């Protein structure tokens, strides 16, 4: 056991450095490089670009994303909130800096696995950015606002069997999907299960996951000791599916009892290791559990892997289906089918007719929840050098320009000579367009593969220091990653050079004559915006500009978070940047290609004007979780003063921002713990409460600190 743990000590990554926008753009001009010096940053008060330079110092830019607050960190990565400057939508950006080829392969494997998984109960990867100059790989992940299931259980003590059954069914449904796509997670634990704002579960952090090959066994020591089965702790060869089932049993035990079957003595060593290796544990005497849930836990936590319950046995268990009409995977498949049917009914008859003409009938079922599919395909400009020759799924261009393509997106090209927009499917003929604002008048030919998925150009990065790979947990990753095992995925490909598919004579005319007209009008500044702005404002048929009709939604400028959002770091909903055409400082998207270039400074100015600085935000109203120790009849001002006195007496450093306290303390092992205390109103009652949120640090030490604070407050 000790020898296995010591094998992690040979990998130590450097601290991840943050690069400002001015630094990332230094290769473009000498002006931007000179602005990075300390002397240039200290400009005089009368300097006209002072507001922009101040904004650059506050927020860092990575590709098309403004980096905000850190919401998680580990030994090899850190997770930040990132705001897309084009859409205003927020994501969780996982930043890693590999030093060795092995570490880079592990990140490649994680990206490759996330590319093939498309499920509501699995965290989604939207994009991946590789920064060649600083050696960073950034994963743009879905932002889950509810936090970890561990914190959810700590706030409630334990879950009822009904609520635990709901989460367990969702976890089981996501795991069935992973195993059906030959992926084992190998690091299932409460910290890697996230709860969204709707109370649904999502599996995250696939850093230890691997591809299952029939007949091959795995031998890597990975995962957390409390959740790892005996075969991993004894360094035996094992089957990845059986490892996940053991971890599911430990998670279910923790949900319904509020504690783990085994405890850690110093955060690493398991107390009672001999009992763990034999699969022996006891249920707490003060918790009353049904015989069905005990039987299910006893079937999953079995020392012998071959005697452990299978997924088919678990999904048909009496306790799992109690109160439900269908099994978990059947219920999910029905929900997805109903959702797709509802979306098809909402489409206009003309759009349905167009889809039937351009797509074969077999493609209507391409969103099957059990079949993997590629999410994105890359079109690389100028270079096809892969990040690592052993992986076909991650391609890093030598120059920093890229075109990222999203599946199932049609390009609408509006021609001034024809009022009716021509809907062209990219999977039929190559579409050629010119973007002088992004690629300096370089022509790009984008053609899609002969796959059943229609693909279109989506984004062209204006940043010369970043290159993007096809999208394929926003949580901290600890320890050494297991050696990657690559598997060729036929569903994930690259865009070929030529495509000879054709439809009919009328459609061929669109691709031949319309293409020349398109280039002709583009150089006369008469053509309309293409898929870049069509994808951003898809509800508009004519995407010539952004009008003031779009709903004004404010996005923060202080590192991706303003004072209003700061009260709720993880409860952030997707929003759009309001670019008002009537505002003199806001950028406008025009049909002219020369006006399509807009800078970060314009976006930041528009955000700053709309952010409403200095206004005291309203206190949030929440349903819970609350108990008698975290609720009070005191008004918010009195409660804030009471919390400040308590934090000062306990020597916990903090910084208050309206109703939120950013706290920092040290655990007994001298590890820093960052967490939040938010004052909020209890929904439907005339009383107020406090809510704790862990940002980084040891989970158990954080739980002990919260208990001490609640006890000392004496609300």
Swiss-Prot record:
Disulfide bonds: none
Compositionally skewed regions (Basic residues) per UniProt: 517-527
Region entry Disordered, spans: 24-65, 335-399, 446-530
Low complexity biased stretches: 24-37, 345-368, 451-478, 487-513
Extent of Polar residues compositional bias: 381-399
MF terms in GO: ATP binding; protein serine kinase activity; protein serine/threonine kinase activity
Residues reported to bind ATP: 71-79, 94
EC number: 2.7.11.1
Gene Ontology biological process: protein phosphorylation
Coiled coil, from the record: none
SMART domains: S_TKc
Keyword Lyase: no
Basic and acidic residues composition-biased segments: 335-344
Limits of the KA1 domain: 666-715
Gene3D superfamilies according to UniProt: Kinase associated domain 1, KA1 (3.30.310.80), Transferase(Phosphotransferase) domain 1 (1.10.510.10)
Sorted UniProt keywords: ATP-binding, Kinase, Nucleotide-binding, Serine/threonine-protein kinase, Transferase
Family annotation (InterPro entries): KA1/Ssp2_C, KA1_dom, Kinase-like_dom_sf, Prot_kinase_dom, Protein_kinase_ATP_BS, Ser/Thr_kinase_AS
Chemical reaction(s) catalysed: L-seryl-[protein] + ATP = O-phospho-L-seryl-[protein] + ADP + H(+); L-threonyl-[protein] + ATP = O-phospho-L-threonyl-[protein] + ADP + H(+)
Top class in the EC scheme: transferase
One family name in Pfam for this protein: KA1
Active-site feature positions: 187
Domain Protein kinase residues, every copy: 65-320
Annotated family: Belongs to the protein kinase superfamily. CAMK Ser/Thr protein kinase family. SNF1 subfamily.
Name of the protein described by the UniProt record: Probable serine/threonine-protein kinase MARK-B
Originating species: Dictyostelium discoideum (Social amoeba)
